[in-house]
Amino acid sequence: QDSGRVPYGYVWQGRQYEGLSCVYLEMIEGFGGEWLTPETGRVGLDQAPGIAATRWLDDLIEAGISPRAVTNFSESEALQSFKSGQAAFMRNWPYAWAELQKNDSAVNNKVGITTMVAQAGEKPAATLGSWGLSLLSGSARPESTVEAFKFLTSEDSQRYLYTNFGYTPTQNALFNDQDLLQNHPSLASIGEALSFARSRPETPLYAQARDVLQRKLSSTLTGLTSPTQGMEQAERSTEQVLE
């Protein structure tokens, strides 16, 4: 960015929606904190790591490393910006890799994958996605559904889905498949990132808690409140939700 090769250094999901929650989870964990500890009900937003995570995101915008428009970015806007060569780094989900290798991508064959940044001495974090397969207890065809699950999660199916559509496999064996790694070396980096996957807070009140975080964090990123004020309000409101 300083050399003028790209307009921006980093693009991510800054819109007031679930993507912002995922970004924040990775940052607070990377600063050594925790959004919410389900076992104790402790909220960590107004603690040093929570404030530092918010300030780090806010500073990206204030310093011009991220565009101010990032507060309106979802996955697609971030991907389009990076895909067109407008930013040096991007935070996104693994599916983006396949998109970046298409013929209309300005960065085709010029992209690498790494883990999220973290403060020195802390481990990086990667928000666990929400896709999964489930069987309703009242299903009329449970046996055939289970067979479909087995087929979709088999090594052969996951190899096909990854090589053709970029869907990240869940079978550990595929991350050590030498033939697959030879043709898709990025898979090793994806596997490393997955080792740091973290779930969003496991609480029946998650929808309400995430709404609080998104509103308060968005308020800070758009310049209405300071990081300290925003997280103080977010923690207080979250505690009220959990009462």
Label every PLM stretch briefly:
Residues 1-15, 154-164, 240-243:
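Bilobed periplasmic-binding protein-like "clamshell/Venus-flytrap" ligand-binding domains
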Residues 9, 61, 88-92, 112:
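Paired acidic/hydrophobic, glycine-rich loop segments that form the ligand-binding mouth/hinge
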